[in-house]
A protein has these predicted regions:
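N-terminal accessory segment at the very beginning of proteins
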Residues: 1-171
């Protein structure tokens, strides 16, 4: 995964897709996903509108991006084996007002409030890391599929379900 942190936004490229997370109003973000070969400049329709300019100017001073190096070594390695198989990765955080988006070293997104409590996170079930949910279903949180007979794409996004959750503005 390759991550770029320019222009107050996170841009991650991986698996034939490009993910963009950017501030969008006060304490909110806009998340977009494109096929890797798609030219994003062609799809920046909102960027020329006065509404977009007002949104980006309003949050430009409230948005911060930071990165943190994390240990990704599997937990069963101890002692000399740990040193031999030691790995690190980088987690990225975009904070806009009271909302923080974490993009971890494997490309998984999670959303936190100002107190650091998880609001929601993407629903991934695969066999990539055995110390997490390890199921043979290979359910990914984001699927980008081309629509038959055209140049458009359809995206399916999955999030974890929590008791008493309230999610607004998706769709």
């Amino acid at each position: 995964m390759t991550v770029n942190t320019e222009n107050n936004r996170l841009t991650a490229s991986f698996g034939g897709a490009r993910l963009i997370v950017e501030p969008w109003g006060e304490s909110s973000v806009r998340v977009r996903m494109y096929p890797a070969l798609c030219d994003i400049a062609e799809d920046e329709r909102l960027s020329s509108s006065p509404y977009y300019s007002a949104l980006t100017e309003q949050v430009s001073h409230n948005c911060t991006i930071r990165s943190e190096e994390v240990d990704t070594t599997d937990p069963w390695y101890k002692g000399d084996e740990y040193a031999q198989y030691h790995q690190t990765g980088t987690d990225y955080y975009l904070t806009n007002g009271k909302l923080t988006v974490k993009l971890d070293n494997e490309g998984r997104m999670s959303f936190y409030n100002q107190r650091g409590e998880v609001l929601t996170e993407e629903y991934w079930r695969d066999r990539n890391r055995i110390n997490r949910y390890c199921v043979p279903l290979r359910i990914v949180a984001r699927e980008l599929k081309p629509r038959q007979g055209g140049t458009d794409y359809e995206i399916t996004v999955r999030f974890e379900a929590y008791d008493n959750e309230k999610i607004f503005g998706m769709g």
